């Protein structure tokens, strides 16, 4: 009895009698109290929420996500946890600083230790400290990195895919033991030197960088251009044509090799955080023990490119998804004519077209990675995904910029970066034209290469 009296007293202290008197002149208080008493807990909670908001319940909007078909729910709990771990890192560590570094064309080296803690480098490789996860997980990681910034995803792709991949697929056991553990921990940085100033798509038959055997060493001469990570790499995978048999071979070039020179490339409009370099090799001496022992022709080089081309398709998805999600978020906050622009028909049409492309791309690359995990991936599979995803990404980022109006070209709204970086994705790891010829050869039975 005493406790009930105490509760009644506490309730009485909080009653505003003047307000209650004014209210009783407008409504039948006993009737209201009876109606409120019949409400269940959920109904009462809803009523209180409405009262606290001044009688106007705030509209709860759907979450901002580009995963409209919930593809991530097909992942195992372990893989889903890793995906969210990478996403958190990118949103908390990269998003706040990315525009400044992009504008200054510098790389944020301070993030490398935290990136290493994610333990995702060399994600599909077995041994040497590598995680030995699926190709699907590798694709998911590439997408999550590119969803915030394509440059960081490209840096990672060069290190984990092209550089480490060349050693993992084509190196001797001694070479793997020497390089892969340190590269996996991001203590040793790698680069991949294939493209040349006058040779891009025609690398299979047109490399001008030469390698001349001289006893137990090789002499390398030539130039490489657009080489990501080149300005700070500890080891560079250099592809050169053997002057004796005319076959392409791979070499592990150490950064302190005499005759090696690298200059940072400036004035890029895309992937500005990536440190691309122009490499000059002048009588660089490389030991036979530093030649990739299983890289005997360009067919072996193509094995590396096939593996990484699938990752670039995922990267395109991430770029498109990031642009779409920023655009969607913007349109729900930006008001014109008294309401969010997301409420207008034409804006919704653009958003749906963007989402359609992002969803189609995601389902395509998901199947692509399944083929890779099943050992069924062919050149034409990866090439088709690269063609389709890079094209659709261009369309998505264009519409994302469009719905933002003039603000779409400001870095602070993020989409401008994606617009620029989509152009780089469109070109590297095989142009649309080269990849189209690869797919065309597969479906027609005729090669149109000249």
Per-region residue spans from a language model:
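A short, Trp-centered hydrophobic/proline-enriched beta-strand micro-motif
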Residues: 186-195
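Conserved hydrophobic/aromatic beta-strand scaffold that supports enzyme active sites
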Residues: 191, 208-210, 235-239, 250-252, ...
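A short, charged helix-loop
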Residues: 277-303
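A short core secondary-structure module
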Residues: 217, 221-262
């Amino acid at each position: 009895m005493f406790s009930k009296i105490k509760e009644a007293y506490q309730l009485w202290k909080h009653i505003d009698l003047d307000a209650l008197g004014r209210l009783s002149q407008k409504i039948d208080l006993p009737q209201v109290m009876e109606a409120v008493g019949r409400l269940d807990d959920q109904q009462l909670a809803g009523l209180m929420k409405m009262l606290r908001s001044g009688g106007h319940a705030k509209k709860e909007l759907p979450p901002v996500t580009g995963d409209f078909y919930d593809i991530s729910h097909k992942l195992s709990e372990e893989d889903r946890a890793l995906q969210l771990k990478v996403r958190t890192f990118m949103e908390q560590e990269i998003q706040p600083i990315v525009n400044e570094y992009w504008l200054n064309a510098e790389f944020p080296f301070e993030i490398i230790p935290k990136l290493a803690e994610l333990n995702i480098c060399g994600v599909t490789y077995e041994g040497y400290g590598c995680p030995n996860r699926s190709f699907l997980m590798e694709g998911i990681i590439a997408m999550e990195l590119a969803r915030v910034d394509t440059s960081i995803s490209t840096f990672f792709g060069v290190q984990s895919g092209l550089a480490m991949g060349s050693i993992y697929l084509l190196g001797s056991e001694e070479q793997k033991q020497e390089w892969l553990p340190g590269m996996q921990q991001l203590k040793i940085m790698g680069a991949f030197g294939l493209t040349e100033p006058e040779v891009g798509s025609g690398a299979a038959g047109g490399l001008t960088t030469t390698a001349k055997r001289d006893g137990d060493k090789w002499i390398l001469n030539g130039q490489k251009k657009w080489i990501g990570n080149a300005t700070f790499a500890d080891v560079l995978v250099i592809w050169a044509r053997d002057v004796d048999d005319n076959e392409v071979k791979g070499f592990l070039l150490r950064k302190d090799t005499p005759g090696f020179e690298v200059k940072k490339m400036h004035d890029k409009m895309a992937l500005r955080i990536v440190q691309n370099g122009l490499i000059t090799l002048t009588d660089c001496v490389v030991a036979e023990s530093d030649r990739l022992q299983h890289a005997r022709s360009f067919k072996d080089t193509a094995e590396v490119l096939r593996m990484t081309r699938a990752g670039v398709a995922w990267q395109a998805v991430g770029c498109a998804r990031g642009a779409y999600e920023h655009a969607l978020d913007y349109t729900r906050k930006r008001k014109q004519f008294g309401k969010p622009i997301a409420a207008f028909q034409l804006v919704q049409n653009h958003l749906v077209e963007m989402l359609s492309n992002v969803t189609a791309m995601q389902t395509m690359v998901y199947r692509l990675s399944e083929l890779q995990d099943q050992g069924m991936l062919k050149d034409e599979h990866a090439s088709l995904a690269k063609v389709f995803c890079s094209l659709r990404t261009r369309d998505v980022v264009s519409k994302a910029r469009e719905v933002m109006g003039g603000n779409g070209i400001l870095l602070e709204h993020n989409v401008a970066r994606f617009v620029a970086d989509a152009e780089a994705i469109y070109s590297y790891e095989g142009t649309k034209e080269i990849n189209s010829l690869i797919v065309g050869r597969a479906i027609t039975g005729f090669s149109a290469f000249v």
